[in-house]
Structures are given as structure tokens and as C-alpha cells.
Swiss-Prot record:
It is found in: Cell membrane; Cytoplasm. This is Protein translocase subunit SecA 2. It comes from Streptococcus sanguinis (strain SK36). It is a peripheral membrane protein. PROSITE patterns: SECA_MOTOR_DEAD.
């Protein structure tokens, strides 16, 4: 906190400079205020920096905010805006106006002409903020666009996207930006590209995007895989295993693997001798997928089974928010393994065409900043991973919410009934209540109990999230009772209804401590916004998931069989200090494990990041290279010919002829009887002649240098893309296959890096051969419009 105090003092000095321009800006006409934008651009061109301009530019935006929106940013909002410009994280409490705060750094950084972007977690917020705040930017002469559309079925064309991303300021969502990046890197030509270089970004709810979503990569799926029958076989096998005897489950690392006895059981079940030999890699992959499906993925925590239009389906849940992740599937066959576990129809397993994690996506920006209500507790991770400080911004009004001590019980039913008594007490007074649960299942249990007590309420979980923003916004009305899963309503302000403040404000009841402290803070933060009164309280039992998973072994002895009737009448609160310390220790252990898991994800993703950047850079170089495509092709052709002539041997003329028919030309003449198949020079000369004949024939047929260049470029890009798809898919399968090899005394990460490197080198060789094959062995045709139609081998 001492460090934060000094940071605040430093920010106040810059704030004073901003305020020194206040009266001057207030005296300007609208036209004069608007002219400041051009003046700032000219001063930048003359050598001033954005830091030099900040005090005056922020004063301009404050005045524009007041004139256009009727809102003048508070001093604390200006301090948050300074933090954002500096590329750090501003921790600002709920209701402190993060949306308005962002107008200042977005305007300032957009003055450079290199673009500024605000990324939020959902389409509704991106469109709302772009529409409302966009009035300010347009008033000041800047362009602003939203890169998302309300109708998710509507697809923007590359031309429309190019216009959007060329705007000075862009509002979008993390997923939309990620998919736009991946899709652009599958483009065949310049006309299909649309992104501007990534310059400056503000990430709203930065901890949710960069930490909580860090382990779910964005994936574009392509061609389907051949469906395997191993899923049901392995699912059956897993049900025969006993924990600790046949497999070990590590709570802390959230990993599971076979013991030596389990390996023998697998070899016996599958009638194999060596389970982990190279030829059994696909079996091992499916075995690991099934094991993970049964032990790592929990129904109603990580996914729900929902009745679809025709059949039941597995739909993923966002653990942090409790929301359904529609249209999202686990990759590498994990989704199908869960479907096999739940005995629903298996969906088609597809290959991953392109993939990136949010960590690596946002590292592409020159400068990252972010806003959140709960960043300070994970400051060390932001500093280690992104070199960003977290600065806690004071609230504009003092927080007067009462955070009451936790109530701790031995059993789950005791806790539930005690919390229900608390709900009835406050409901009788007329206080609005917001009850947060840790799972869909618990939210529905509380809903049933409230119905039994005759208490009308709204239930908000993954099964009925359509009216989320509306339900949360109305939950501050007198007598309102809302039951919700952990983080519902993030980004939505709860305003108190008439008379509620006199009753003590909104009461937030947490029915369990969550697996990280940030979610608990966010739950508390639903109440007591902008100086409003409020109350928050958590009810905990020793049987909660947090303590079951992360508590000490001696705690398990206290679990007992119980009669619901008995505990309902006499819930006994645990008051001993040792129990209270347990919760904090369990939460720290959980957070430490999650941090380690994110670090491992980043280390695995780093390997793909390097390979992806090399591949995408090569693609873009070819798309941009108008004249140099011939040189590139000559270089690749020479390498492939050299390899075929000098590094391969042919026993007979028939062998050489078969090679030519498979890789160079369908039209080649038979090899002369006197041809020396043992002379690499002769073979190289022959292959060079055949290649030149094929290329000249295609060029003559097209009768256009432009069409021929287009054909060459598409041939090369197709080879790159097909082989990169194979490599992405291979890396995903490799990670799964190696994840279960803990018994082997080898570091899975080191093994992964070595195998991935070898795979990448092999991919590059395959790619060169495919380029030559595409160029020489494709069939061409011209349609009536004069466009070339290509049929690749």
C-alpha cells in the first residue's frame, strides 16, 4: 500500500496540470475546442510526445465530455486515465465510471494516427459504449467504429472491416478481435486483409480476459477428422479404474495420470504390450482425454447437458461467470470425450486451422493497459507476465458498505439453512437481496428453497441468462430477491430503488467462498456503489468445494453423515480461529495453482506462438510481394530439386518415373533407356526441365502475367495453409498425448518443445514439396468472366 500511496501522489501532480487548463477549455467555443485535435497532431509532428500533450489533451476531453454527455470526469477518473495511458492497470471500484475514464487515453493515443482500441467482454457493452462515447470523439474530429454487430449471424465483409479498423478509435470484444486476427491470417490476397497494426489497447475487465480466460485458446476449426470409435472404448475403460490405485489425481495442479498399475490395466484391456510406444500415440491421446473428462471436468461447474432441438448436447460453462459458452467447444477431442462420458451423441471432431491465446493476442500490441475492480490481488502476475503495475484508484465517494464477518458451519445443509434465515430476515425488512452461488446446481437448490418459503425471486444462471443485464439492473429495487451464479452482471450498475438506502441498501449474500479472492471482491462490489449503503456477507461450510479441494487432510475427518431435519433445526456456527484461517489458506493455495496453470499454458503456447509468427510473417510477405513471387518460387524449386536429386536414390528408371508422376508432372515422357539414374546432376537437370515446361505451359494457357502471378501466389499460400493446419492440429494432439506421461521421469514440457520443433522442421519440408506440386501438377481453367479456376492435386 505504501507503493500505491506514492503512485497516487505522483498522479495527483499530473492531475494538477490537467486542472490548470480547466478554465481555459471552458472558455473555448465548440469550434475552438474541436480545433485542438488538429493542433495536437501538428505538435506531435513537430516533435512533442503524447506525454507532453497529456495535461492539455485530457482537459480538452473533460470539457468535451461535459458538453456532449453532460458528465464531467471526476479527479479520480482523470487519475485512472493517466494510469491507462502509461500502460498499466487501473483498479477502479464498481460504479466509478470506467467507461468515461477511457475517453481520455483513447483520445490521446488516437492522436498519433496509429489507432487506439477498447476491448470489452461482450458485444452489448462494446456497442453501448461505442455509441455513447462515440459522440465525444466525433465532436472532437476523430473517427470511431465498433468492430462487432448486434446480430451475430451477420458477417462483415473484409472491405467493411477494413473501414472499421482504419478508424482512429475502435470498440470491440476480445473474442471478435481474436477471430478477426486469425481469419485475416488465412487471407489469400491484400483485398481480404483488413487489420491495421496493433498500437494501443485498453482492456476492460483485464483480469477476466488475461487471467481467467488465459487457458481457453481461440480456435478456428476447419476440415473434420475421421470420427474415432476410441471415445466410447476409453470411456468404458475409465469406469473400471480406481482412484490412487490405477490413476493419480492432483487437486492442486488439476492434473490426472495413470499409475504403473493403471498402465498395466490399460495394456491388458487394450491387449497391448507397450502402451506408450510411438505407434500407440493415438490410443494414449484418447485415454488421456477420457481420464480428463471424468476427473477434471465437472457437470454443472464446467459444462451443462442441455436438451437441444433434436438431442441432448454438452454446452461449456464459463467458471468465472457461470455463463454458457455458446458455439464454443473444447479442442483436441476433449469435447467428444465429455460427450462420451455423458452418453450424448458425439459431435464431429474438427481440425484446428488456426489458434491463439488471449495472452499472445494482446502481446501483439505496442502498449497494453486495462481496467478492473479487482487487480491489486494479482499485481505480481500482471508484473511478471505483462510488465504492468496495478494502481488502486481512490473512490470518488467513500465506500460505506458493511462487509460483515463470514459465518462458518460444519455441514453444507447447516450453511444453506442459516443463509436462508438471513435472507428471510432482510427480505422481511424490504432490503433487496442478491444471492450468489458457485454453481448452476446450487443456484437451483436455493431457488427451490425460496419457493418453498413463498419468496418471489429471479433466478439467473446459465440455463436462463437471456435477461441478465435487465435482471441485475432491477435487483436494487425494494423487496427484490435475485439468485445468481458467481459473476453474473459484471459491467452492469445496480441502482438502488426508492427507500432502499434508508433500509441499509442492497444486501449481497455469498453462499460460498470462490476459488479466487477476486471473485469474492467482485461479488461484494455489486453492493455499495458510488457511496451507496450496502451489506455483504459470506456463508461457508467445511464441505464447500474450496475447502474440500484445498483444505488440509485433517479436515476430512470432520465430514459426517447427517440428517437434514437435525441440522435444519440447529445450525451450529464454528467460531474457532483455526477454521477461519483455513478459508484464506485454501484460497491462496487455489490462486497459486491457477497462476501456475496459467504459466504452464503460456509456456506451451509460446512454442506455437513462435511457429505461428514465422508462418504468418511468411504468408504476409508473399501476399505483399508483387514482383518477388518468381524469386521465391525459384528458390523453393531449387531446394526441392536438389533434395530429390542429391538426397534420394532410385533403384530403377521406373522408380524415378513414378517419383516424377507423383510430384512433378502427369505429362512427363518415360525415362530414356540410356538415362543415368545414378547421376544426381542428370536427375536435377531432368527435373528442372520438366518444371520449366509445366510452368511455361500454364503461363501460355493463361495469357496474362497478372493471372499467372495470382495462380503462383494462391498455389504457395494453399501449401502454407494446408501444412500449417496439420501442424496446429499436431501440436494440440501432441500436448494431450504427453500430458499423461508423469511416470516416465521426463519433463512433458521439454518433450513437447523437442517434438514440436522436429514437427515444425518436417512441416517446412512438406510445405516446399507441396508448393512445387501445386505449381506443377494443378489443372487450370478460365471461366466466361476470364477468371482462373484452379484444381490442385
Amino acid at each position: 500500500m505504501i507503493k500505491n500511496h506514492f503512485q497516487i501522489q505522483r498522479l495527483k501532480k499530473i492531475l494538477a496540470k490537467v486542472k490548470s487548463f480547466e478554465s481555459e477549455m471552458a472558455g473555448l467555443t465548440d469550434a475552438e475546442l474541436r480545433k485542438k485535435t488538429q493542433e495536437f497532431k501538428e505538435r506531435l509532428a513537430a516533435g512533442e510526445t503524447l506525454d507532453d500533450l497529456l495535461p492539455e489533451a485530457y482537459a480538452v476531453v473533460r470539457e468535451a465530455d461535459k458538453r456532449v454527455l453532460g458528465m464531467f470526469p471526476y479527479d479520480v477518473q482523470v487519475m485512472g486515465a493517466i494510469v491507462l495511458h502509461e500502460g498499466n492497470v487501473a483498479e477502479m471500484a464498481t460504479g466509478e465510471g470506467k467507461t468515461l475514464t477511457a475517453t481520455m487515453p483513447l483520445y490521446l493515443n488516437a492522436l498519433s494516427g496509429q489507432g487506439a482500441m477498447l476491448v470489452t467482454t461482450n458485444t452489448y457493452l462494446a456497442l453501448r459504449d461505442a455509441q455513447e462515447m462515440g459522440q465525444v470523439y466525433r465532436f472532437l474530429g476523430l473517427t470511431i467504429e465498433a468492430a462487432v454487430v448486434a446480430d451475430e449471424t451477420e458477417n462483415l465483409t473484409p472491405k467493411q472491416k477494413r473501414l472499421i479498423y482504419q478508424a482512429d478509435i475502435v470498440y470491440t470484444t476480445n473474442s471478435a478481435l481474436g477471430f478477426d486476427y486469425l481469419i485475416e491470417n488465412l487471407a489469400e490476397n491484400k483485398d481480404s486483409q483488413y487489420l491495421s497494426p496493433f498500437n494501443y489497447v485498453i482492456i476492460d475487465e483485464i483480469d477476466s480476459i488475461l487471467l481467467d480466460s488465459a487457458q481457453v485458446p481461440l480456435v478456428i476449426s476447419g476440415a473434420p477428422r475421421v470420427q474415432s470409435n476410441f471415445y466410447s472404448i476409453m470411456d468404458t475403460f475409465i469406469t473400471t479404474l480406481k482412484e490412487e490405485e490405477d490413476y493419480h489425481y492432483d487437486d492442486e495442479k488439476n492434473e490426472v495420470w495413470l499409475t504403473s498399475k493403471g498402465i498395466l490395466a490399460a495394456e491388458s484391456f487394450l491387449d497391448l504390450e507397450h502402451l506408450f510406444s510411438k505407434e500407440n500415440q493415438e490410443l494414449v491421446r484418447h485415454l488421456n482425454l477420457a481420464l480428463r473428462a471424468h476427473k477434471l471436468y465437472k457437470k454443472d461447474k464446467d459444462y451443462v447437458v442441455r436438451q437441444g432441438d433434436k438431442e441432448a448436447e454438452v454446452v461449456l460453462l464459463d467458471r468465472a461467470t457461470g455463463r454458457l459458452l455458446e458455439m464454443t467447444r473444447l479442442q483436441g477431442g476433449q469435447h467428444q470425450a465429455i460427450e462420451a462420458k455423458e452418453h450424448v451423441k458425439l459431435t464431429e471432431e474438427t481440425r484446428a486451422m488456426a489458434s491463439i491465446t488471449y495472452q499472445n493476442l494482446f502481446r501483439l500490441f505496442r502498449k497494453i493497459s486495462g481496467m478492473t475492480g479487482t487487480g491489486k490481488v494479482v499485481e505480481s502476475e500482471f508484473m511478471e507476465t505483462y510488465s504492468m503495475s496495478v494502481i488502486k484508484i481512490p473512490t470518488n465517494q467513500p465506500v460505506i458498505r458493511q462487509d460483515l464477518p463470514d459465518q462458518l458451519y460444519q455441514t453444507l445443509p447447516e450453511k444453506v439453512f442459516a443463509s436462508l434465515d438471513e435472507v428471510k430476515h432482510y427480505h422481511a425488512q424490504g432490503n433487496p437481496l442478491l444471492i450468489f452461488t458457485g454453481s448452476v446446481e446450487m443456484s437451483e437448490i436455493y431457488s427451490s428453497l425460496l419457493l418453498r418459503e413463498g419468496i418471489a425471486h429471479n433466478l439467473l444462471n446459465a440455463n436462463n441468462a437471456a435477461r441478465e443485464a435487465q435482471i441485475i439492473a432491477e435487483s436494487g429495487q425494494k423487496g427484490a430477491v435475485t439468485v445468481a451464479t458467481s459473476m453474473a452482471g459484471r459491467g452492469t450498475d445496480i441502482k438502488l430503488g426508492p427507500g432502499v438506502a434508508d433500509l441499509g441498501g442492497l444486501v449481497v449474500i455469498g453462499t460460498e467462498r470462490m476459488e479466487n479472492q477476486r471473485i469474492d471482491l467482485q461479488i461484494r462490489g455489486r453492493s455499495g456503489r458510488q457511496g451507496d449503503p450496502g451489506i455483504s456477507k459470506f456463508f461457508i461450510s467445511l464441505e464447500d468445494d474450496l475447502l474440500r479441494k484445498w483444505g488440509p487432510d485433517w479436515l476430512k475427518k470432520l465430514y459426517k453423515d447427517y440428517s437434514t431435519e437435525e441440522v435444519q433445526q440447529h445450525p451450529v456456527q464454528l467460531g474457532q480461529r483455526r477454521f477461519r484461517r483455513l478459508v484464506a489458506k485454501a484460497q491462496r493455495a487455489s490462486e497459486s495453482s491457477a497462476k501456475m496453470s496459467r504459466r504452464m499454458t503460456l509456456e506451451y503456447a509460446q512454442c506455437m506462438k513462435i511457429q505461428r509468427e514465422i508462418t504468418y510473417a511468411e504468408r504476409n510477405r508473399l501476399i505483399q510481394a508483387e514482383e518477388r513471387i518468381d524469386e521465391e518460387i525459384s528458390r523453393v524449386l531449387s531446394q526441392v530439386i536438389h533434395q530429390a536429386a542429391y538426397e534420394q536414390s532410385y533403384e530403377t528408371r521406373a522408380d524415378l518415373y513414378r517419383f516424377i508422376l507423383d510430384h512433378f508432372s502427369y505429362h512427363a515422357e518415360r525415362i530414356p533407356y540410356d538415362f543415368d539414374i545414378y547421376s544426381p546432376e542428370k536427375i536435377a537437370e531432368l527435373l528442372q526441365d520438366i518444371a520449366e515446361q509445366e510452368l511455361q505451359a500454364k503461363k501460355a494457357y493463361l495469357k496474362s502475367d497478372k493471372l499467372f502471378t495470382h495462380f503462383q501466389r494462391v498455389s504457395v499460400l494453399k501449401a502454407i495453409d494446408e501444412n500449417w493446419v496439420e501442424q496446429v492440429d499436431y501440436l494440440q494432439q501432441l500436448k494431450t498425448a504427453l500430458s499423461g506421461q508423469h511416470f516416465s521421469m521426463k519433463n512433458p514440457l521439454v518433450e513437447y518443445y523437442q517434438e514440436a520443433y522436429d514437427g515444425f522442421e518436417y512441416m517446412k519440408e512438406r510445405m516446399k514439396q507441396q508448393i512445387v506440386k501445386n505449381l506443377l501438377m494443378s489443372e487450370l481453367a478460365l471461366n466466361p468472366k476470364g477468371e482462373v479456376i484452379m484444381y490442385f492435386p
